Every structure is written in structure tokens, then in C-alpha cells.
């Protein structure tokens, strides 16, 4: 078992990334911007929707086309009167051009507006994906740091219990303690070994989670500088104020509002199917032909034909089998759907924003409590070990105090990371999160040794 554990820990400490990667949060985020599939898909969708604008605009512009044709042939004919065969050769050349343009198609202008609004909505979705990436990268990064901290604490706890186990065995050998104390210490040591294995595996899991986002394995990531770490009450300092900020700036909410505009214009576009349309058209066609025959009864000729036309076409829809009315009803139902989506998004934004604010405030208090808990646990362990030396405390008391100390350290470590994550979640809900937040957090890291 010791050999297996050593192999696992060695793999953790000596693993190298498949691709070279910088080891701080900012570099990991930049790598994620280039490789995260969610962001790249949102970017691609935005590019797709932008082209809809060009396609919708194109039908409003003149449509010009040109044609050309050439044919060459030969015809043989037999005359029973003259008992002779004659041959006629002919060829023709034709070309033309046409210009068509919509003078009035109300639905075409509405479709252009819908395309613009849809592209704007897609752009907002892309921005949302990038905001979410900040949160996801930071969460994955600090989950990995937390796993590494847990391994350090597990190894330190195991080492402390190993010393206590050895001390208990020595005391038992000279008759100063009972065999039950040895068993208690051995059981705690075995638990510590199990926790070390679990912590080591958690690092592998966290590395894989980060790799999914960045497409490279992390290596020697920078740690949180606990000496410089400090907490700050969110500004503004009330849940109501953050709710107002979110209602004005949250991109999910803004996206849903644009969806309402798109749905309304879709109704107008469907109704435009009842409107008349007016089109302009102009065309020119020319053809030249030549016929040459050896039959004296047939004359060779060189016909030329030119054709010009220009005009407007008015189309007034009278009855389309109910298709237009159906399209209007469908668009109206889609508007109801978009309205409900906006309402649900607003409720979710209010809930997540207020919860995020309260969570940040609670986490700040939690950090202060865990800092005091670590100090108290350290003093308690010292006192318990001193009592054990003089016989007033048992090895069970020492083991419990040891476990309490490292539990407090784990809780403090994880709560610090949770504070950073909760602040980002609050800013994400409030619509104020930016790349600068990554830079600010990165400045609070220290290069891994």
C-alpha cells in the first residue's frame, strides 16, 4: 500500500503537461479564450447571424443578371420533285441583361431589422459566454488549488499522526499506555493514509476539469498568496442595490429583452404578408442569326432581333389559403414564449444576485471564524499534547485535536477560495464582471515553487 501511495503522489508532483502552459490564472484564462468550446461555439453563432444581415439587405438592392447563348447547326432536306438533297447551315448568337429591384416590400425591411436584432442578441450571447468563462476558469483553477492544499494538509496530518503512533507504541512498550491506545492511533493513521490517497486523486480530477476548458494540462499553477489575502465588503453594500445593478446590466436579462424585440418584429413581418408589393424590372435582349443554303429556292438571311422592356409590377395579395393568418398566430405565440422567458430570466437574475451578495457577506464572516478556529485548534492541540505527556489526556484526545486542527485549516483554505468565487459570481449576476477581475485576482497569486 505504501508503494502504491508513493507512486500516486509521485505522479502528482512530477506530472508534466502535454503542451507547455504558463502557470498563473491569467495565462490559463487566455488559453481558455482560445480553446473553450462553449465560447468558440457562441462566437461562431454570432458570425453566422451577422451574415443574415447581409443576406436580408441583399434583396433590397438591385438584382442584375446577364445571359449569352450561341448555337450552330446544319440541316439536310430531300426533294422528291428534283430528286436532290440540299444542305442549309445556320448559327445564332444571343445575349441579354436584366435588372430587377424591389420598390416596396415592407416585409423585406422588417426581415432586415429582425436580422440586425437577432445578430445583436447573438453577440450578447457571445459576451455572456465570455463572462461565464471567467467564472468557470476561476472555479476550475481554485478547485485545483484547493485539491493541492488538501493533499498538503493530508500529508502533514498523516505525518503528525505517524509521530503520535510511534510515540504511543514506545509508551506501550514500557507499560505507560494500553494496547487500545495503539489501536486508536493506528486506526487514525490508516484514515489519514486514505485521506491522502483521496486528496491525490482529487488533484487528477481537478486537472482534467481544467483541461476540458483550456485543452492543455495545467502545470505548477500559482498559489494564493495568503499573506496578502484580504476580504472586502461588496460595493454597493446592499442586496437591493446589487439587484438594481443587475436589472440594468445583467447580459442574460438584456438578451431576453432583445428577444422580445425580435418576437415583436416577427409578428409585424408576418402581418406584412397582407401588404401589396411593388417591383421594378428592365431587360434587354438581342439575337443575331445567319442561314446559308445551297438550295436556290431558299434564300440566305441574317435576321437580327432586339427586345427592350421596362416596367413596374404591383402585386396585391388577396387570399393565400390562410397561410398569412397562421404565420401571424405563430409569431404571436412566439412573442408569448419570449415574454415568459424574459419574466423567468428576471426572476432568476434577482434570485441569483441577492443570493450571491448574501453569500459573499456570509463567506467574509466565515473566513474570520475559520481563522480564529485555526488559532484555537493549534492552542488546543498544544494543550492536549502537554496533558498527554503528564497523563491527564489520552491519545484519543490528542488524535481528535490533531484532526480538528487540520479540518480547520482545510475549511479556512476552501473558504478563501469560495470567497473569490462568490465575488465573481456576484459580479457576473450584476453584469459588472470583466477581464480586469482576472488580472486583479492574478495579482494576488504567488508563483509556485
Predicted segment positions?
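Bacterial Sec-pathway N-terminal export signals of envelope proteins
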Residues: 20-69, 75, 218, 224-261, ...
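Amphipathic alpha-helical coiled-coil segments
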Residues: 41-56, 129, 133-152, 163, ...
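Acidic, low-complexity, intrinsically disordered peripheral segments
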Residues: 411-449
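A glycine-/polar-enriched beta->alpha junction
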Residues: 30-38, 47-62, 96-114, 124-131, ...
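Periplasmic alpha-helical coiled-coil/stalk elements that build and connect Gram-negative outer-membrane
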Residues: 132-247, 359, 363, 404-405, ...
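Small/polar, glycine/serine/threonine/aspartate-rich low-complexity segments that form flexible
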Residues: 67-101, 227-235, 268, 281-316, ...
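Transmembrane beta-barrel architecture of outer-membrane proteins
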Residues: 27, 92-96, 139, 184, ...
Amino acid at each position: 500500500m505504501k508503494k502504491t501511495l508513493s507512486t500516486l503522489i509521485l505522479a502528482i508532483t512530477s506530472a508534466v503537461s502535454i503542451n507547455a502552459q504558463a502557470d498563473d490564472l491569467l495565462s490559463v484564462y487566455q488559453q481558455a479564450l482560445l480553446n473553450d468550446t462553449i465560447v468558440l461555439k457562441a462566437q461562431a453563432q454570432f458570425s453566422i447571424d451577422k451574415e443574415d444581415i447581409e443576406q436580408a439587405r441583399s434583396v433590397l438592392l438591385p438584382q442584375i443578371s446577364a445571359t449569352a447563348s450561341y448555337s450552330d447547326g446544319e440541316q439536310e432536306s430531300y426533294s422528291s420533285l428534283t430528286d436532290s438533297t440540299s444542305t442549309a447551315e445556320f448559327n445564332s448568337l444571343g445575349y441579354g441583361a436584366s435588372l430587377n429591384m424591389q420598390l416596396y416590400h415592407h416585409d423585406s425591411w422588417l426581415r432586415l431589422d429582425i436580422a440586425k436584432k437577432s445578430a445583436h442578441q447573438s453577440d450578447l450571447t457571445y459576451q455572456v459566454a465570455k463572462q461565464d468563462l471567467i467564472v468557470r476558469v476561476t472555479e476550475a483553477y481554485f478547485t485545483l488549488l484547493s485539491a493541492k492544499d488538501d493533499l498538503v494538509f493530508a500529508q502533514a496530518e498523516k505525518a503528525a499522526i505517524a509521530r503520535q503512533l510511534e510515540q504511543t507504541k514506545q509508551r506501550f512498550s514500557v507499560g505507560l499506555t494500553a494496547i487500545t491506545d495503539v489501536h486508536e492511533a493506528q486506526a487514525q493513521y490508516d484514515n489519514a493514509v486514505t485521506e491522502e490517497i483521496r486528496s491525490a486523486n482529487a488533484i487528477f480530477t481537478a486537472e482534467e476539469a481544467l483541461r476540458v476548458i483550456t485543452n492543455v494540462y495545467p502545470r505548477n499553477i500559482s498559489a494564493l498568496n495568503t499573506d496578502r489575502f484580504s476580504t472586502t465588503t461588496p460595493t454597493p453594500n446592499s442586496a437591493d442595490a446589487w439587484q438594481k445593478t443587475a436589472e440594468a446590466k445583467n447580459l442574460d436579462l438584456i438578451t431576453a429583452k432583445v428577444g422580445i424585440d425580435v418576437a415583436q418584429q416577427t409578428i409585424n413581418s408576418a402581418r406584412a404578408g397582407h401588404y401589396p408589393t411593388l417591383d421594378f424590372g428592365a431587360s434587354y435582349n438581342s439575337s443575331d442569326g445567319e442561314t446559308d443554303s445551297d438550295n436556290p429556292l431558299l434564300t440566305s438571311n441574317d435576321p437580327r432581333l432586339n427586345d427592350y422592356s421596362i416596367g413596374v409590377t404591383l402585386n396585391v395579395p388577396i387570399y393565400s389559403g390562410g397561410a398569412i393568418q397562421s404565420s401571424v398566430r405563430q409569431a404571436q405565440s412566439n412573442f408569448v414564449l419570449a415574454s415568459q422567458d424574459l419574466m423567468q430570466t428576471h426572476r432568476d437574475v434577482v434570485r441569483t444576485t441577492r443570493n450571491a451578495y448574501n453569500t459573499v457577506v456570509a463567506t467574509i464572516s466565515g473566513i474570520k471564524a475559520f481563522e480564529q478556529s485555526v488559532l484555537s485548534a493549534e492552542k488546543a492541540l498544544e494543550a492536549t499534547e502537554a496533558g498527554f505527556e503528564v497523563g491527564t489526556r489520552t491519545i484519543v484526545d490528542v488524535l481528535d485535536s490533531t484532526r480538528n486542527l487540520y479540518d480547520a485549516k482545510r475549511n479556512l483554505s476552501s473558504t478563501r477560495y469560495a470567497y473569490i468565487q462568490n465575488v465573481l459570481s456576484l459580479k457576473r449576476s450584476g453584469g459588472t464582471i470583466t477581464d480586469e477581475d482576472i488580472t486583479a485576482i492574478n495579482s494576488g497569486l504567488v508563483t509556485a515553487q
